[in-house]
């Protein structure tokens, strides 16, 4: 009978041990396991949200980069057009200035040419009078001289 009492005692001790474990040890272990499961689930959902946010941020960054490239292209085109406009304006202004300078130079040349012709006519007239005086060997008065010079200038 010894054997039966020992088994019965061990069975009672085991039942008490199981009851003790179910009451005092099992609930904290289950709470810790459930807490850890919840933390893992939260971490996974947080990682999922972070991945979605990252994808959204990358899409936004790509869109902004495309917009920036488009704006840069527009700015480059505007700058190129402005450069061409400035060059055209500068060329037109330079052409006007050149034409103005050429016109002024031509006017100065014409005025100098007229003045030189007048001077030459007067000198030719004076030489002609001097030659005529020497040939005639007489002196012509100043009023007659002036009339002769004017007639010669008009003829030349």
From Swiss-Prot:
Q: Which InterPro entries match?
A: ATP_synth_B-like_membr_sf, ATP_synth_b/b'su_bac/chlpt, ATP_synth_F0_bsu_bac, ATP_synthase_B_chain
Keyword vocabulary terms for this entry: ATP synthesis, Cell inner membrane, Cell membrane, CF(0), Hydrogen ion transport, Ion transport, Membrane, Transmembrane, Transmembrane helix, Transport
- Entry membrane topology: Single-pass membrane protein
Coiled-coil annotated spans: none
Which regions span the lipid bilayer?
11-31
What name does the UniProt record give this protein? Answer: ATP synthase subunit b
- List GO terms (cellular component aspect): plasma membrane; proton-transporting ATP synthase complex
Where it sits in the cell: the answer is: Cell inner membrane
Give one GO molecular function term.
proton-transporting ATPase activity, rotational mechanism
Q: What does this protein do?
A: F(1)F(0) ATP synthase produces ATP from ADP in the presence of a proton or sodium gradient. F-type ATPases consist of two structural domains, F(1) containing the extramembraneous catalytic core and F(0) containing the membrane proton channel, linked together by a central stalk and a peripheral stalk. During catalysis, ATP synthesis in the catalytic domain of F(1) is coupled via a rotary mechanism of the central stalk subunits to proton translocation.
Q: How does it assemble?
A: F-type ATPases have 2 components, F(1) - the catalytic core - and F(0) - the membrane proton channel. F(1) has five subunits: alpha(3), beta(3), gamma(1), delta(1), epsilon(1). F(0) has three main subunits: a(1), b(2) and c(10-14). The alpha and beta chains form an alternating ring which encloses part of the gamma chain. F(1) is attached to F(0) by a central stalk formed by the gamma and epsilon chains, while a peripheral stalk is formed by the delta and b chains.
The UniProt entry's sequence similarity note says: Belongs to the ATPase B chain family.
Going by the entry's taxonomy, the superkingdom of the source organism is recorded as Bacteria
Principal localisation: membrane
